[in-house]
UniProtKB/Swiss-Prot annotation:
It is found in: Cytoplasm. SUPFAM superfamilies: Ribosome recycling factor, RRF. Belongs to the RRF family. GO terms for molecular function: ribosomal large subunit binding. InterPro entries: Ribosome_recyc_fac, Ribosome_recyc_fac_dom, RRF_sf. The gene is frr. Its main location: cytoplasm. GO terms for cellular component: cytosol. This is Ribosome-recycling factor. Pfam families: RRF. One of its GO terms (biological process) is cytoplasmic translational termination.
């Protein structure tokens, strides 16, 4: 029973950290990266379709993304979707290729993004700690039902704490890397 509880906590903590990394990757840095456009949905024949299903997105240089739309008739809809997204990007169509120059981030915008990333990291830490609390509660329930001894309970709680520390450290490292990325000019 203890092993299952600890494994469940570990799996949930891993998912929390992965979710945080995914959220952080969506925060725009000064560099062009195709994942910036992951959240863009295009109205394609009346259906909202993810942009990455309609176009090949590549990085042309550190400040420019290039899109090659598979269906040329959808180019206008793709451009409109990018303009209407909250990313603040202005695509420029050049025949079959749509180029998206990324404006450099201002110092003020960088600081705002760092605040956002720090808040996301704190939410990630809170999620990991909540998982720890749930797992420790499950262990205490096993102790109350006399399915485990007090020593087993203490050992399980120590192991859960080690897992918590490990995943909080991963969150802190991801935050540090993202902050450095954001503040880099």
């Amino acid at each position: 029973m203890i092993k299952e509880t600890i494994e469940d906590a570990k799996d949930r903590m891993e998912k929390s950290v992965e979710s945080l990394r995914s959220q952080m990757s969506k925060v725009r840095t000064g560099r062009a990266h195709p994942s910036i456009l992951d959240s863009v949905m295009v109205n394609y024949y009346g259906t909202d379709t993810p942009l990455k299903q309609l176009a090949n997105i590549t990085t042309e240089d550190s400040r420019t993304l290039a899109l090659t739309v598979f269906d040329k008739s959808a180019s206008a809809a793709v451009e409109k979707a990018i303009i209407n997204s909250d990313l603040g990007l202005n695509p420029a169509s050049a025949g079959a290729v749509i180029r998206i120059p990324l404006p450099p981030l201002t110092e003020e915008r960088r600081r705002d993004l760092v605040k956002i990333v720090r808040a996301e990291a704190e939410n990630g830490r809170i999620a990991v700690r909540n998982i720890r609390r749930d797992a420790n509660g499950d262990i205490k329930d096993l102790l109350k039902e006399k399915e485990i001894t007090e020593d087993e309970e203490r050992n399980a709680e120590e192991e859960i704490q080690k897992l918590t520390d490990k995943f909080v450290k991963q969150i802190d490292e991801a935050l540090k890397a993202k902050e450095a990325d954001l503040m880099e000019i």
